Amino acid sequence: ITDGWLSSEAQGRRSIYRYSESGAKRDRLAQPRVYQNANDLWDGEWHVVVANNWSSDPELYAQYVRDLMWSGFGKISENVFIRPRVSDKSVCCCRELAESISPTSICFTAETARCVSQEPLVDLIKRTWDLDTIKSRYEVFIDRYEPLLAAVWKNPRLPGAQAFAIRLFMMHDFRRIRLVDPMLPPALLPDSWSGDQAFYVAHELYDLLIPSSEQYVMEYMQG
C-alpha cells in the first residue's frame, strides 16, 4: 500500500486488498520482465524518449519516470531516456508504452554508429544502469535459492503449505530484482552476468513447486 501497488477496503473486521489502478498497470509492465529472459540479439538500435518535464505535473512526471524504468529504460539526462531496441520492431515504442509516457513526450529510434570506439558506449551503460548492484542482488538470490532447488529436486513432494510459501517468497524476491534489471541484450552486459543463472533457478524451482502449491491453494479455497 505504501508503494502504491495495493488498495484496501474494510469489510467489517476484514480488509480486502486488491491491485490499485497504478499497481495493475505496473504489473502489466512487469509480467514479461519476470517470466521471460533477455536473450535477444541486438543490432545497435535504441528507443529514445524525450520528455517535456517542464510542462508536466511533478508528481505525474515522477510516475512516468518510474514506469519507464520498469520498462527497461535508463535515464541519461533529466528528461532523456534510452533502452536497446530488441522487441518486435513493427511495434512503435510510443504505442507499447502508451500508459508509461507523458502525452507530451517524444519517442523515436536511434542507432549506434559503428565507426566509433565502443568505449563511450561502455561508459554510457555504466553511468545509466547500476549493473554491479543488480548483479550482486542476483548472486544473493542464487545463494539463497539454489540450495533449495537442489533439495526440492531430491524431494519434490513437499507439503502444500511449504511449497506455496517457498514459491511466494521466491517469486517476490525475484520480481524485486527484475523490476530494476533493464534486461539488456547480452552484447551490452558485463562478463559473468548472474542474471541468466538466477532466471534458471527461479524458473526450475517455480515449475517444481507448482503441483503441490496449486493443490494447496485449491484445497484452501474450497474450505
Regions found by a protein language model. Give the residues of each.
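Short amphipathic beta-strand starts and helix->beta connectors
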Residues: 3, 29-36, 63-67
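Short, Lys/Arg-rich nucleic-acid/phosphate-binding segment
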Residues: 10-16
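Short, amphipathic alpha-helical interaction segments positioned at domain boundaries
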Residues: 22-47
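Glycine-rich, often proline-containing surface loops adjacent to acidic residues and nearby aromatics
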Residues: 41-50, 74-79
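Mid-protein regulatory/catalytic core that forms ligand/cofactor-binding pockets
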Residues: 54-152
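C-terminal regulatory/effector modules of DNA-binding transcriptional regulators
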Residues: 113-223
